[in-house]
Amino acid sequence: MNYSFIIRKAVESDAEAIHNILKEAFKDYVIRAKIDETVELKTETIEDIKKDLQTKEVFMGLIDNVPTGTIRVAIQDDNTAYISRFGVLPEYHNIGVGKALIKVVDKFLISNQVKKVFLHTASTYKELVTFYYNLGF
Protein backbone atom coordinates (compact mmCIF):
# COMPACT_ATOMS: atom_id res chain seq x y z
CA MET A 1 0.00 0.00 0.00
CA ASN A 2 1.45 3.36 -1.04
CA TYR A 3 0.50 6.51 0.74
CA SER A 4 1.89 9.95 1.40
CA PHE A 5 2.74 10.73 5.02
CA ILE A 6 3.91 14.15 6.13
CA ILE A 7 4.32 16.02 9.38
CA ARG A 8 4.17 19.79 9.34
CA LYS A 9 3.64 22.71 11.65
CA ALA A 10 -0.03 23.43 12.10
CA VAL A 11 -1.54 26.74 11.08
CA GLU A 12 -4.71 28.50 12.20
CA SER A 13 -6.80 26.96 9.43
CA ASP A 14 -5.96 23.52 10.92
CA ALA A 15 -7.70 24.30 14.23
CA GLU A 16 -10.94 22.53 13.36
CA ALA A 17 -9.11 19.41 12.12
CA ILE A 18 -7.00 19.39 15.30
CA HIS A 19 -10.17 19.68 17.37
CA ASN A 20 -11.71 16.74 15.53
CA ILE A 21 -8.59 14.57 15.89
CA LEU A 22 -8.39 15.21 19.61
CA LYS A 23 -12.12 14.67 20.12
CA GLU A 24 -11.95 11.23 18.50
CA ALA A 25 -8.61 10.29 20.05
CA PHE A 26 -9.85 11.37 23.47
CA LYS A 27 -12.96 9.17 23.24
CA ASP A 28 -10.67 6.20 22.68
CA TYR A 29 -8.25 7.34 25.42
CA VAL A 30 -11.02 7.62 28.04
CA ILE A 31 -12.16 4.06 27.32
CA ARG A 32 -8.68 2.51 27.22
CA ALA A 33 -7.42 4.44 30.25
CA LYS A 34 -10.61 3.79 32.22
CA ILE A 35 -10.81 7.41 33.35
CA ASP A 36 -13.53 9.99 33.94
CA GLU A 37 -14.67 11.86 30.83
CA THR A 38 -14.62 15.21 32.62
CA VAL A 39 -10.93 15.79 31.94
CA GLU A 40 -10.03 19.29 30.71
CA LEU A 41 -9.61 18.30 27.05
CA LYS A 42 -13.35 17.80 26.73
CA THR A 43 -13.93 21.54 27.12
CA GLU A 44 -11.26 22.73 24.66
CA THR A 45 -12.68 24.86 21.85
CA ILE A 46 -11.42 25.67 18.38
CA GLU A 47 -10.64 29.17 19.69
CA ASP A 48 -8.50 27.63 22.45
CA ILE A 49 -6.57 25.73 19.79
CA LYS A 50 -6.06 28.93 17.77
CA LYS A 51 -4.60 30.59 20.87
CA ASP A 52 -2.23 27.67 21.42
CA LEU A 53 -1.10 27.94 17.81
CA GLN A 54 0.21 31.39 18.70
CA THR A 55 2.07 30.37 21.87
CA LYS A 56 3.12 26.73 21.36
CA GLU A 57 4.59 24.57 18.66
CA VAL A 58 1.79 22.50 17.16
CA PHE A 59 2.45 19.75 14.64
CA MET A 60 0.10 17.69 12.49
CA GLY A 61 0.52 14.33 10.82
CA LEU A 62 -1.28 13.81 7.53
CA ILE A 63 -1.76 10.69 5.42
CA ASP A 64 -2.74 11.45 1.83
CA ASN A 65 -3.56 14.98 3.03
CA VAL A 66 -5.97 13.65 5.67
CA PRO A 67 -5.17 14.97 9.18
CA THR A 68 -4.48 11.91 11.33
CA GLY A 69 -2.56 13.11 14.38
CA THR A 70 -1.44 16.15 16.31
CA ILE A 71 0.89 17.13 19.14
CA ARG A 72 1.71 20.34 21.01
CA VAL A 73 4.84 21.33 22.85
CA ALA A 74 5.67 24.38 24.92
CA ILE A 75 9.20 25.34 25.90
CA GLN A 76 9.18 26.69 29.44
CA ASP A 77 11.29 29.54 30.87
CA ASP A 78 13.58 27.02 32.60
CA ASN A 79 14.40 25.46 29.19
CA THR A 80 12.31 22.37 29.83
CA ALA A 81 9.39 21.44 27.62
CA TYR A 82 5.90 20.12 28.16
CA ILE A 83 4.15 17.92 25.60
CA SER A 84 0.37 18.12 25.53
CA ARG A 85 -2.64 17.45 23.33
CA PHE A 86 -1.03 14.47 21.63
CA GLY A 87 -3.52 12.36 19.76
CA VAL A 88 -3.89 10.11 16.75
CA LEU A 89 -7.19 9.07 15.22
CA PRO A 90 -7.94 5.53 16.43
CA GLU A 91 -8.11 4.12 12.90
CA TYR A 92 -4.48 5.25 12.37
CA HIS A 93 -3.06 3.68 15.54
CA ASN A 94 -0.11 1.30 15.27
CA ILE A 95 1.16 2.47 11.88
CA GLY A 96 3.77 4.96 13.10
CA VAL A 97 1.90 8.27 13.14
CA GLY A 98 2.34 8.84 16.88
CA LYS A 99 5.96 7.73 16.89
CA ALA A 100 6.74 10.06 13.98
CA LEU A 101 5.08 13.00 15.75
CA ILE A 102 7.12 12.37 18.90
CA LYS A 103 10.33 12.12 16.84
CA VAL A 104 9.63 15.45 15.13
CA VAL A 105 9.04 17.08 18.52
CA ASP A 106 12.24 15.47 19.80
CA LYS A 107 14.27 16.96 16.93
CA PHE A 108 12.62 20.35 17.48
CA LEU A 109 13.50 20.27 21.19
CA ILE A 110 17.09 19.17 20.56
CA SER A 111 17.50 22.05 18.09
CA ASN A 112 16.33 24.38 20.87
CA GLN A 113 18.74 22.87 23.44
CA VAL A 114 15.91 21.60 25.63
CA LYS A 115 17.31 19.02 28.06
CA LYS A 116 14.16 17.79 29.83
CA VAL A 117 10.71 17.01 28.50
CA PHE A 118 7.58 16.32 30.52
CA LEU A 119 4.17 14.91 29.69
CA HIS A 120 1.26 13.39 31.55
CA THR A 121 -0.75 10.32 30.71
CA ALA A 122 -3.01 7.90 32.54
CA SER A 123 -0.99 5.14 34.18
CA THR A 124 -3.98 2.85 33.64
CA TYR A 125 -3.47 2.94 29.85
CA LYS A 126 -0.67 0.37 29.81
CA GLU A 127 -0.13 0.35 26.04
CA LEU A 128 0.38 4.11 26.01
CA VAL A 129 2.72 4.00 29.00
CA THR A 130 4.75 1.34 27.16
CA PHE A 131 4.71 3.48 24.00
CA TYR A 132 6.20 6.44 25.87
CA TYR A 133 8.68 4.25 27.73
CA ASN A 134 9.93 2.75 24.46
CA LEU A 135 10.51 6.28 23.16
CA GLY A 136 12.69 7.19 26.13
CA PHE A 137 10.22 8.80 28.53
Give short role names for the model-derived ranges.
Residues 6, 23-50:
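Conserved GNAT-fold acetyl-CoA-binding loop/helix
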Residues 6-20:
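A short beta-loop-alpha structural element at the N-terminal edge
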Residues 10, 86-88, 121:
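Hydrophobic adenine-recognition pocket in adenosine-nucleotide-binding enzymes
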Residues 60, 66-74, 82-87:
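Conserved beta-strand in the GNAT
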Residues 75-84, 93, 113-114:
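A conserved beta-turn-beta hairpin within the catalytic core of GNAT-like acetyltransferases
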Residues 88, 94-107, 133-134:
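Conserved acetyl-CoA-binding loop-helix of GNAT-fold acetyltransferases
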Residues 109-121:
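Conserved GNAT acetyl-CoA-binding A-motif
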Residues 119-129:
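Conserved beta-strand-loop-alpha-helix junction that forms the acyl-donor binding cleft
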